[in-house]
């Protein structure tokens, strides 16, 4: 049976993504000076105000107000009529240190309190919280990501690009994209059914003008010719007007675009957000590692689709459970595949941080256009450097 599946993305000027970028810009500034800092920073944006709150334990000093303003201005909110102005907005900060009760479990995992020996200081790290994290990969795109979310991200990136470089001069920073893909009976994407773009714009431009520009400069360069047909629907600003945007139109909050950040709804989500969190928080680091595992399994040709769920207890280094699902696409025995994954990959938070080199100021750029499927050497969880080991485990 054929089916339709839809995913959305948003531009860097969307209020929730602004909040994510501010939180991660603060994290980067701290971790650059103090890689072992503990950071959990949330941002709320509304008309004329940015509020930053959270828990930070660090030896570093950072100018929160300056970081907020520079991030907002870099996104493109340089005038109040756009819905926010980085120069004139109020910035309120309420940051305190990490709870000592939480620090007890993160600084020294439960296993080592019970007498186990740590091979290495960093492997003493316990999970910063309980929860479950999911990783996924599919061979339907070269990025080994679901096609709907990849196209939605690419449209959103192109929308921001043509705004910033002046190709489409009447655009403003806020915007959203959405792509509906038709899949055939074999779960292969066969066509784009619907493309939706809602973009903030100057007040004196008409919808036909916006549509013409977006089709020419955004949609045509991104949507592959082989996935188009005469029945493909294009929707541009279907409300008819999108002049007021940004935090003046909608309150922005860190962690409210977790499906955009991951796989566009193609698989479950454990609920934990990424931005503003240092890598001892498994909400972030274990999600990255789960993607790393899934991508390597699919890249090795062991399955066409691969999902993994990993679950943790706060203060405990080793996961409480690991579950895999190949959706019937495994090329090897699935039970053996699970065992091989558990043997080859070390899911302890300290080992994850070490393997993926996560104690670096790399997070601001993850905070818009997806954390996965990106071609950037700093996104170490996108490497496929475990393919040889995985194949060897199956004598391939």
UniProtKB/Swiss-Prot annotation:
GO function terms (MF aspect): ATP binding; magnesium ion binding; methionine adenosyltransferase activity
Keywords, sorted A to Z: ATP-binding, Cytoplasm, Magnesium, Metal-binding, Nucleotide-binding, One-carbon metabolism, Potassium, Transferase
Binding site for L-methionine: 55, 98, 250, 281
Signal peptide limits: none
Top-tier EC class: transferase
Entry binding sites for Mg(2+): 16
Residue numbers binding ATP: 14, 174-176, 241-242, 250, 256-257, 273, 277
Enzyme Commission (EC) number: 2.5.1.6
Catalytic reaction equation(s): L-methionine + ATP + H2O = S-adenosyl-L-methionine + phosphate + diphosphate
A single GO BP: one-carbon metabolic process
Alphabetical list of Pfam families matching this protein: S-AdoMet_synt_C, S-AdoMet_synt_M, S-AdoMet_synt_N
InterPro entries: ADOMET_SYNTHASE_CS, S-AdoMet_synt_C, S-AdoMet_synt_central, S-AdoMet_synt_N, S-AdoMet_synthetase, S-AdoMet_synthetase_sfam
GO CC terms of this entry: cytoplasm
Pathway: Amino-acid biosynthesis; S-adenosyl-L-methionine biosynthesis; S-adenosyl-L-methionine from L-methionine: step 1/1
Keyword Cell inner membrane: no
Compartments where found: Cytoplasm
Function, as annotated: Catalyzes the formation of S-adenosylmethionine (AdoMet) from methionine and ATP. The overall synthetic reaction is composed of two sequential steps, AdoMet formation and the subsequent tripolyphosphate hydrolysis which occurs prior to release of AdoMet from the enzyme.
Assembly notes: Homotetramer; dimer of dimers.
Family: Belongs to the AdoMet synthase family.
Descriptive protein name: S-adenosylmethionine synthase
Organism in which the protein naturally occurs: Fervidobacterium nodosum (strain ATCC 35602 / DSM 5306 / Rt17-B1)
Gene: metK
């Amino acid at each position: 049976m054929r089916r339709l599946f839809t995913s959305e993305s948003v531009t860097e000027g969307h209020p929730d993504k602004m909040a994510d970028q501010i939180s991660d810009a603060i994290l980067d500034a701290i971790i650059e000076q103090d890689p072992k800092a503990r950071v959990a920073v949330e941002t709320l944006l509304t008309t004329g105000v940015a509020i930053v709150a959270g828990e930070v334990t660090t030896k570093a000093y950072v100018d929160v107000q300056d970081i907020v303003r520079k991030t907002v201005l870099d996104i493109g909110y340089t005038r109040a009529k756009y819905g926010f102005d980085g120069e004139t907005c109020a910035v309120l900060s309420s940051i305190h240190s990490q709870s000592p009760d939480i620090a007890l479990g993160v600084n020294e995992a439960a296993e080592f309190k019970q007498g186990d020996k740590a091979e290495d200081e960093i492997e003493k790290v316990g999970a910063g919280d309980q929860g479950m994290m999911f990783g996924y990969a599919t061979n339907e795109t070269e990025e080994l990501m679901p096609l709907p979310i990849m196209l939605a991200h690419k449209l959103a990136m192109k929308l921001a690009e043509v705004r910033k470089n002046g190709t489409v001069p009447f655009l403003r920073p806020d915007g959203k994209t959405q792509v509906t893909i038709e899949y055939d009976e074999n779960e292969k994407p066969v066509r784009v059914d619907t493309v939706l773009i809602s973009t903030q714009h100057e007040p004196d431009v008409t919808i036909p003008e916006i549509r013409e520009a977006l089709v020419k400069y955004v949609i045509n360069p991104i949507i592959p010719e082989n996935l188009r047909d005469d029945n493909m629907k294009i929707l541009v600003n279907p409300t008819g007007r999108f002049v007021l945007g940004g935090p003046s139109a909608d309150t922005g909050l860190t962690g409210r675009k977790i499906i955009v950040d991951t796989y566009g709804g193609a698989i479950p989500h454990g609920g934990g957000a990424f931005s503003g969190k240092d890598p001892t928080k498994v909400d972030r680091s274990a999600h990255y590692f789960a993607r790393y595992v899934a991508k390597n399994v699919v890249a090795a040709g062991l399955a066409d689709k691969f999902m993994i769920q990993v679950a943790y207890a706060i203060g405990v280094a080793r996961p409480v459970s690991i579950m895999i699902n190949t959706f019937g696409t495994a090329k090897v025995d699935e039970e053996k595949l699970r065992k091989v994954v558990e043997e080859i990959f070390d899911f302890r938070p300290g080992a994850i941080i070490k393997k993926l080199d996560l104690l670096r100021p790399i997070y601001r750029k993850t905070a818009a256009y997806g954390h996965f499927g990106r071609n950037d050497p700093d996104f170490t969880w996108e490497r496929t450097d475990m393919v040889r080991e995985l194949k060897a485990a199956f004598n391939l």
